[in-house]
Amino acid sequence: TDEEKDYVLDVVMKREYATGSIVNTEAGIGMDDRWKAKVFGLRYDDYTRLSAFANLNNLNENQTPGADGDWSPKKQTKGLLTTKQTGLNLNVNNSKKTFSLDQSTLLEWSDKNTVMQRRSETFSKDGSILGGTLSSNDLSDFTLTNNTFINQTLGRFLLSTGHHLVYTDQDDTSLSADSTYQTDIINTDHRRILSTSKRLFGNGHFGLSANLFGSGNTTSLYANYSFN
C-alpha cells in the first residue's frame, strides 16, 4: 500500500489584504441635559497599528478603549463628572522582529461637581432648634499621561527603554455654609477655600541584555529612575 503523505500549504497574504481600518462612533442626548459622544479609529498593516479616540460626556464616565476599540467604562459614583478625553496608541514592529515601539498618549479634561446638603432639628423646652449644612466642591483637572516603550535587538544585544510621564493641573474650589436658628439665626458660618496644584512625575528605565557566549545565559544591566 502507498504510504499516506502529509502536505503543508504555505499561504502568504498579499500586503493589500493585510491592511485595514476601522472607525466606530457613538453619540446621544438625554433628559436633564445629559449628553455623550465618542469616536474610535484604527489603522493597521503588517508592521504598524495606529489607533486614536475621543470621548466627551457628562454621564460620570471616563472611558478609554483598548488597542482594538473595546471600551472599559469607569464610573464616578458621587457628584457630576464631565469628561473630555482624547488619546493615541501606536505599535510598530519590523519584518525581522528586531525592533518594537509601543507608544500611548492620553489627554483628559474633567470637571467634577459635588453638592451635599443636611438638615437637623433639636428639640428643647424653649422650642426646636433647626440646623442646616450646605457644602459644594468644584474640581477642574487636566491630566496628560504618556507611555513609551522601545526594544531594539542588535546581534546578541537587546536594548530596551521605557518611560512613564504624568502631568496634572488642578483647580479646586470648596464652599460650605453652616447655620443654626430658632425664631432667629443663632449662628452662621461661611467658608470658601481655593487651591491650585500642578505636578509632573514619572519613572522609567534603560536596559541592556547580552547573550555573549550563545549558551542561553544572559547578562543584563538596568538603570531605573523616578521623579515627582
Which functions belong to the PLM regions below?
Residues V12-K14, A37-R43:
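Feature captures outer-membrane beta-barrel proteins of Gram-negative bacteria and organelles
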Residues T1-D33, T48-N228:
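Primarily recognizes Gram-negative and organellar outer-membrane beta-barrels
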